[in-house]
């Protein structure tokens, strides 16, 4: 239980010029975890001293980043079963105060609009055509071709707001919605491109022959076949590798999201963010 008087007294000492006192106060406040953030934010608004403001902001970020790392570690160690949860954890890196339920509700709304129109006997391609119609035509999602390196393309909440994303963020939303509708669509970690596969569930144990077709979520849900993947790999001078054709793990998907963010922030020259994102990448092995 936090003692407000003690916490506020510690916060007032954050601008102390004595480094030993500052280090002690910093560690003490850090130990409170997320409970102390509300007090720090109030103090930030009331602070006139630039050093104190900077130290408060850094401390808030440190607490939030530490919590994010712990949550990502727990998600990974628990089996990484929920792709949406993993994506929301990464989203908190840039938007720590966002209510996850808001994002979940947005995805549920899209799912519901598809479900209402879905026929029980629809074939796999008919199912995908309906998802494409609702996702791209009604909701207006599209690939961000004009600013592909923008880090916002990788943050789920922003993609849902702007309706623009990169290959992997659009594929994540698409596959999460499909799976909520019991449609077997999963991510495939193709080099330089992230695609989706529609599985023939009766042959799920053998992914290579159990894939009915592939889907390009970045290009309005375009359906294509194995030969197209063969040709793409040939253009890249890459030899056959089963992993380029088969669904990958949720951990692999989140690692790719983080790598995209690292590239985006390297492009912007944000060394601190690159270092922190590498920490997140290391958690996933």
For each of these PLM feature ranges, what is it?
Residues 1-285:
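A structural boundary/capping signal
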